[in-house]
From Swiss-Prot:
Its main location: cytoplasm. One of its GO terms (cellular component) is cytoplasm. One of its GO terms (molecular function) is protein-disulfide reductase activity. InterPro entries: GLR_AS, Glutaredoxin, Glutaredoxin_subgr, GRX_bact, Thioredoxin-like_sf. One of its GO terms (biological process) is cell redox homeostasis. Signal peptide: none annotated. PROSITE patterns: GLUTAREDOXIN_1, GLUTAREDOXIN_2. This is Glutaredoxin 1. The gene is grxC1. Disulfide bonds join C17-C20.
Length: 95
């Protein structure tokens, strides 16, 4: 598959965050590839960009699918509960 058409999942996390672990477990269960970005490793400028990209939210996790801000852990699980997550993930690269 051409890399330029790959869809992407990015999750901003902190290692000790239980909600981050829960969100990653759901993505792992869905067998999709995602990029994890540890917020504590970001520079101040990168943190400011992350907060802006997240609509002013600085909490973690913050999840993006194809550059669309999904939100946090509860938002991800709500998409799953509503049956909408699989549709968002259907074109994602699989593990």
């Amino acid at each position: 598959m051409n890399k330029s058409i790959l869809h992407t999942i990015i999750i901003y996390t902190l290692a000790s965050c239980p909600y981050c672990i829960k969100a990653k477990a759901l993505l792992d269960k869905k067998n999709v590839i995602y990029e994890e970005i540890e917020v504590s490793n970001l520079t101040q400028e990168e943190k400011e960009k992350f907060i802006k990209k997240s609509g002013g939210k600085s909490t973690v996790p913050q999840i993006f699918i194809d550059n669309m801000h999904v939100g946090g852990c509860d938002d991800l699980f709500n998409l799953e509960k509503e049956g909408r997550l699989d549709k968002l993930l259907e074109h994602q690269p699989k593990n």
